[in-house]
C-alpha cells in the first residue's frame, strides 16, 4: 500500500501526484492512497475520482482522506485537544462523507474522528503523543452513510478499547507509524 500521496504538501505546494501513483502501480503496489484533504470538497472529489478510476483500471484499491486529522506538530502541537474533540473541529462531516463516497467510488476512506497524526517535526519527534480517543458514535454514523470501510490515521497512542470499539463500528485499517518510527530511531541510536 502506497500511503499519503499528497495533492498539496505540508508547505502548501501542489504535488504532481499522478506520476508517483503510476510508478507505484508499475512497481506492483496493490493499493494507493491519495490525500486531497487540503483541497476544497469539490476539488478533493475530482482528484480522488481521477485516482480511484486509475486505480480500478489497474485492478488495485484506492484510499482517500476527508477531514482534518489533528497533528502533533506545528500548529497542531498548540491546540487544545479537548476543545477540538468537544467541538469536532476538523472532524469528517457526515454529509460530505456520503457525497464523497458516492461520487469518488474510493474503496476506503480515511476519516478524522479524534485521532492525532504522528510526531514528525524535529521538536516533537521523540515526545510521546498526547493520548487521544475516538468518537465511536461518529465512526458508526460515517460507516452507515458511506457504506465503505473506514481508515484511522494516527492510531498510535489510542487505548485498546477505543481501537476495538472503532473496529466494531466501521474502522477497517489503522495506521500506527509513530510507535514504530520512535522505536526504530531509538534502537538505531543505541547501536551507533
Predicted feature descriptions by range:
Residues 7-148, 160-176, 182-183, 187:
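Alpha/beta enzyme core
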Residues 191-192:
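Extended, intrinsically disordered, low-complexity segments
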Residues 153-156:
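Short catalytic/ligand-gating loop segments at beta-alpha or beta-beta junctions
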Amino acid at each position: 500500500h502506497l500511503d499519503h500521496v499528497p495533492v498539496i504538501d505540508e508547505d502548501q505546494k501542489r504535488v504532481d501526484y499522478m506520476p508517483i501513483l503510476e510508478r507505484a502501480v508499475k512497481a506492483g503496489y496493490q493499493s494507493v492512497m491519495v490525500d486531497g484533504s487540503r483541497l476544497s470538497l469539490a476539488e478533493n472529489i475530482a482528484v480522488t475520482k481521477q485516482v480511484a478510476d486509475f486505480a480500478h483500471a489497474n485492478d488495485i484499491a484506492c484510499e482517500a482522506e476527508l477531514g482534518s486529522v489533528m497533528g502533533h506538530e506545528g500548529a497542531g502541537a498548540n491546540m487544545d485537544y479537548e476543545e477540538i474533540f468537544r467541538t469536532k473541529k476538523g472532524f469528517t462531516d457526515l454529509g460530505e462523507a456520503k457525497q464523497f463516497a458516492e461520487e469518488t467510488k474510493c474503496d476506503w476512506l480515511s476519516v478524522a474522528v479524534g485521532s492525532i497524526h504522528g510526531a514528525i517535526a524535529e521538536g516533537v519527534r521523540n515526545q510521546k503523543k498526547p493520548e487521544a480517543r475516538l468518537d465511536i458514535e461518529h465512526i458508526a454514523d460515517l460507516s452507515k452513510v458511506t457504506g465503505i470501510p473506514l481508515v484511522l490515521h494516527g492510531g498510535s497512542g489510542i487505548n485498546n478499547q477505543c481501537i476495538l470499539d472503532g473496529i466494531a463500528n466501521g474502522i477497517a485499517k489503522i495506521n500506527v507509524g509513530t510507535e514504530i518510527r520512535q522505536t526504530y530511531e531509538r534502537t538505531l541510536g543505541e547501536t551507533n
